[in-house]
């Protein structure tokens, strides 16, 4: 028993610990500022980003043209187009480098970063459609027009369902409790928080593979011939 204990202790001493993503100091300061505005902000972003990374659709590189990198989602039924300005990236200005396409116009993503706590209102369109495009749930017989007038959408994953319930019901209300109870057995992979903290963060905000901040966002809508 004593020998086994010593081996375990030696293993722990020799184990290389990863401190976390190696970000510049200004990035840590601004992330901390956002966390202080909404305590759940960072952990929610990391968890949902990981879930989509494992089972959802991906954002893939398409081409480079005229100083921009063009990207699109692998979800062909609900396709979104994004691009990033390489000149801004060269200036280490990642916040305003990304743009999304809506009604044939390119809109800057990153307004939320200037005013933490209000980004959901400022870029609501982008956030909403990013979630739909990245989620791998089947969206059969589902129309955005039905959703906008208040019809339920039970064909989405548990995470999406719970998010909409929480968004459109009052805190601690009986309505919210009843709806969450209905969907509690919906199949979905839950990602524990300790795994979320171990994922490296790079230059791309919304994926575990290409991002500076794991910043969960929805994008402008292309697909099903729908314009915003």
UniProtKB/Swiss-Prot annotation:
GO terms for cellular component: host cell cytoplasm; virion component. The keyword Phosphoprotein does not apply. It is found in: Host cytoplasm; Virion. It comes from the Viruses. Coiled coil: none annotated. Keywords: Host cytoplasm, Virion. Belongs to the ovine/caprine lentivirus group Vif protein family. This is Virion infectivity factor. The gene is vif.
């Amino acid at each position: 028993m004593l020998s086994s204990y010593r081996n375990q202790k030696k293993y722990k001493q020799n184990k290389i610990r990863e401190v976390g993503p190696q970000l510049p100091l200004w990035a840590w300061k601004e992330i901390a500022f956002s966390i202080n505005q909404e305590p759940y902000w960072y952990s929610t972003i990391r968890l949902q980003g990981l879930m989509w990374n494992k089972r959802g659709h991906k954002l893939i590189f398409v081409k480079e043209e005229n100083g921009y990198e063009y990207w699109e989602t692998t979800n062909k039924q609900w396709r979104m187009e994004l691009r990033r300005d390489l000149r801004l990236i060269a200036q280490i200005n990642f916040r305003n480098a990304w743009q999304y396409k809506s009604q044939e116009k390119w809109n800057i993503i990153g307004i939320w970063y200037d005013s933490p706590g209000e980004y959901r209102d400022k870029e609501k369109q982008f956030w909403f459609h990013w979630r739909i495009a990245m989620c791998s749930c089947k969206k059969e017989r589902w129309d955005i027009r039905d959703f906008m007038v208040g019809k339920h959408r039970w064909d989405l994953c548990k995470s999406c369902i719970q998010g909409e319930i929480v968004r459109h019901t009052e805190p601690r209300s009986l309505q919210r409790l009843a709806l969450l109870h209905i969907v509690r057995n919906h199949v979905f992979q839950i990602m524990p928080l300790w795994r979320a903290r171990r994922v490296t963060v790079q230059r791309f905000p919304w994926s575990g593979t290409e991002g500076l901040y794991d910043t969960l966002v929805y994008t402008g809508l292309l697909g099903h011939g729908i314009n915003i």
